[in-house]
Structure formats: structure tokens, C-alpha cells
Amino acid sequence: MNNPLVNQAAMVLPVFLLSACLGGGGSFDLDSVETVQDMHSKPKYEDEKSQPESQQDVSENSGAAYGFAVKLPRRNAHFNPKYKEKHKPLGSMDWKKLQRGEPNSFSERDELEKKRGSSELIESKWEDGQSRVVGYTNFTYVRSGYVYLNKNNIDIKNNIVLFGPDGYLYYKGKEPSKELPSEKITYKGTWDYVTDAMEKQRFEGLGSAAGGDKSGALSALEEGVLRNQAEASSGHTDFGMTSEFEVDFSDKTIKGTLYRNNRITQNNSENKQIKTTRYTIQATLHGNRFKGKALAADKGATNGSHPFISDSDSLEGGFYGPKGEELAGKFLSNDNKVAAVFGAKQKDKKDGENAAGPATETVIDAYRITGEEFKKEQIDSFGDVKKLLVDGVELSLLPSEGNKAAFQHEIEQNGVKATVCCSNLDYMSFGKLSKENKDDMFLQGVRTPVSDVAARTEANAKYRGTWYGYIANGTSWSGEASNQEGGNRAEFDVDFSTKKISGTLTAKDRTSPAFTITAMIKDNGFSGVAKTGENGFALDPQNTGNSHYTHIEATVSGGFYGKNAIEMGGSFSFPGNAPEGKQEKASVVFGAKRQQLVQ
């Protein structure tokens, strides 16, 4: 990375140049041009090396989403072999992403509503439905299960003969979690499944009504399942198809089980088990998402009594609700025979019980500062800082092929323009957004675990970075992020032993800080005060005769991001409190990386 001012100065005095850019995209290790004598007295810093988290899976259909739906298979059972389908398979590409909205609202369900006519729309319910766990039914953020019409489609003119449920298997959540518990928590709920449809396929253990031939066998139609309280023994709490998960948030693991609850009557001497385990779950947490395996519990059932004989390596899901109150996910068995969805929650709160729930820690930051109101608004995130969710629409923040070496870059997708910083940051991203003539700023990052921040004890950790700012008072000033000498600079000294942070934000081509920042560390974040100097900030410094000055004092907040608190960032906004026409306003986002001494 070459600075022309530095190059010119090199012609007249000895200097050292800016350090090499990390990854070809720039770094924050900016030092003023110095003489040889200064080099011996002033230390020089460079970005600490870091590695981005590996992408678990970049395939479109296994990427994070609000939810997924799969069409219930129905094969064309036409009497003419020319049109008859012998097999309607399931495949990984059959899962369709669901968009943001209420959990029980999505386009596939709307499609069924439009064509239902006088038919009943049948869908899974937890409160009094076919599957439920008593004490774990008050779901707010998640829905999972099925929605379908009992409506055959016999259209001889178009050579279509379809029998069985017409609908979808799905899960959907809202408000992806930004905080998660920090201890072991039990979640309970339900699960549902559908199989492929294959000519002459029957599963004796599911009953004749479940399907499998002309249509996929569906959990809602499985026979011999305990669904009614009247048929249960005293104190029984689990009905239908139930799920149970133990999530250890400290070591980021999930263990779970998917059950069938058996209907046992006096005349039923064949099945005396209260529960039958169908799958056990093993998964690992990644931010507010998880990925793992579903292990079939009865692989030896090769006689066709049931379809649950193959493991799945494609299990995925996430936590929903502000503090990880609920979870949901899906998988497809490796033999493509079974598609399954599940949803579960923490135990329902009783009246008068502590509503706060278990202790949590922040795992993700994602927000924007609106350009009109100068207010912080939370936005959704699935924990991938290379993607941004704007009003539920996913934007890739990756640079184009021609911009991969750029320190910051611009993108334009789905009517949104974004300027994204910075190429040397692996665990956070921040920048500017423009949509429908509205200009906002944004920041998102994957927080450092609280335990990692607590383990740091150094008294003088240095972080360097840059910032975007907009400041107004009669006239306005705006500043762009930069890694050039003389550009917008952010510098912080962090004392992890006393939990104190002091820093400055300096504007382009200026020597005095635009803002000084003092803050205190709490857990894996910080909060404090950002304020202009005693004389204020000159919005138009070239106008020496009648320059506009603004005085700002605002609450600043932010967090540490990545492994071992390698990065930090934050923001503040000031919506103004002066009479109309003289309002002082500001919005700022900043990011920085920890520095190391150049050896």
C-alpha cells in the first residue's frame, strides 16, 4: 500500500513506509513519516495476524435462513404408464428458504389458502395439537411442522392424478438471537417428518393411513401414536412426536432426541414402550446457528417397518428470540428417504415466576443508525459478517473480483447500495447504506466470548482503525473510512486489567481529535462517552471567517469481536436537542484491530 505523500517525503529524508497490507487489502498500521532518529524513540505497530472463521457450508440451500419448507411428495399415479411416476424423491435442493415475517406466515402457506376452497387447512399446533410437551407449549418465535389440504388433484385432461396431502413440511423463526444463555439449558418441543413417495412402498410400523406409496408418509397420519390426554396415564406430559435437547452453551454443543410417544391400550399387547427413539441429535453451535448430525436409532429395521434407518449429516438450525428462548431446525436423511423439522423451547414461565430467564451473553451485534432520526435500530443477523440482512433481504458484502484488494468497497444489490469496511477485519464489518434516498450507517460483528475477554490482562493493548461519520449543525460534514495517512483514524488504548478504554477519532486532514472516547468494559462489550473538544468540531474548517462549530456529547457503546478480542468496534448517535434550525446532530460507526510491535 503506497501513500503518495510518503513517497514524496522519501525523496528528501529517510523514512519508513506503511507496513504491508494484510491479505492484499490494507491494514491499520499507520504511522507518521519520521526521521531515523525518531524511529529509535517511537515504537511502530502493525495489525496482529488473524484468520477468519472457516465457512461451514456455502451452499445456497444449507445457508442460514429464517426457515425452510419442503413440498410434501405426491407422485403422479396415472393409470397410463406413459404419465405415471414410480418415484417422487426427496432431495437437498427441495428445501426452499422462507423470508422474514411471522412464523406462521409464508408464501407457500398463502398458496394453500388461495386454493383451499371448502377444504380444511390442516396444520400443526402446539397448544392442543397432535404433538406437544406439557409445560413447553407457549411458543412465540418459532413454528415447525406441517400445513396441508386433504385434497386430491385428478386432472385427466392434463394427465395428472395426485392423491394424498397437498402441502408443506416447514420450520420458521423470527428474531434470530443476539444473546444466548451461558449455561446448560433444556429445550423441549416437537418434530415432524415426511418420506418420499414410491410405488408399492409401505411402512407397516406407521400404519396403512400414513402413506408412502402415492404420497409421502407423513407424521400427522402415523397410527398407534399417543395424541389424546384421555388415553394417557396419570402425569403423562409428552404426546405425539416430541423432541428434547440439552444445549451446553459453554462448550457450544447440542445433544438431543426425537421421540414417538406410543399409544398403549388394554388391547395393545404388541407395544408396551412408552416412547420410541427415532433419532439422536449431535450438533455444534456457530454463533446463533448450529450444524450437526441426526443419528438413526434403529438402523437394523431393514424389513420396511419404518423409514428411520439412515443417519443425516445435513442437520442445521438456529436460535430465535432475543435471548435464545427457542430453537428450530431441519435435516434430510442421507438416503434421501426422510425430511424432518423440529422446534423446541425453554420451559414455559408460570405466573409470578422470574421472567428474566437464565443469564445470557451477547454473541452478535447487528444494527444500523438511521440517517433521518439518528437512532440505532436493531437488524437481524445469522452471524455471518460477510452478509447483511436489510429489512429481511440478504446482501452479500463480499467484494467483486476486481475489488478484492480494496480496503473498502461498494456493492449494489436489490435496490440497496452499501460501502463496506474493512478488508483486514475478519469478525466485524461496518459502513454506509443507501436505500430509497435514505442514508444509514451499519455495524455487525461476532462478539468475543465473555470468558476470552476476562482472560486478557494486558494493561496497554493498542487498537487502530477508522470510522465513518456524519455531523451537522446548520451545515454538515461527512467523513469516509480510510487506511491512508491523514485519513479518518481511530485509535484506542485498552487496559483489560482495569477495564478502561480511552480513544480518539480524528478526521481526515486534521491533527486534533474530532471526538475523545472514554469507556468501561463490561463482559464482552463496552460503554462510555464520546465528546468533541472544548472548542467543538469545525464543520467547514476552510471557512476561517465564519466556520460552523458543533458540540457533541453522546453515549458510545460497542464490543470486542473475534478470537481473543482481536477486533473492536462501536457507534454513537446524537439526534440533537437544540431549537429547530440549530440542531447539532451526529452519527458515527468505527472499527479497529489490535496492534503488535514491529520487531
UniProtKB/Swiss-Prot annotation:
Lipid moiety-binding region (S-diacylglycerol cysteine): 21
Major localisation: membrane
Disordered: region residues: 39-61, 80-119
Cellular localization per UniProt: Cell outer membrane; Cell surface
Induction: By iron starvation.
Keyword Signal in annotation: yes
Membrane topology summary: Lipid-anchor
Basic and acidic residues bias (residue ranges): 39-51, 107-119
Cited function: Neisseria acquires iron by extracting it from serum transferrin (TF) in its human host. Acts as a TF receptor and is required for TF utilization. Involved in the initial capture of TF. Helps select only those TF molecules that can be used as an iron source and concentrates them on the cell surface, maintaining the iron-loaded status of the TF C-terminal lobe until its delivery to TbpA.
Assembly behavior: Binds only human holo-transferrin (TF), via the TF C-terminus. Forms a large complex with TF and TbpA. Interacts via its C-terminal domain with Slam1.
Descriptive protein name: Transferrin-binding protein B
Organism this protein belongs to: Neisseria meningitidis serogroup B
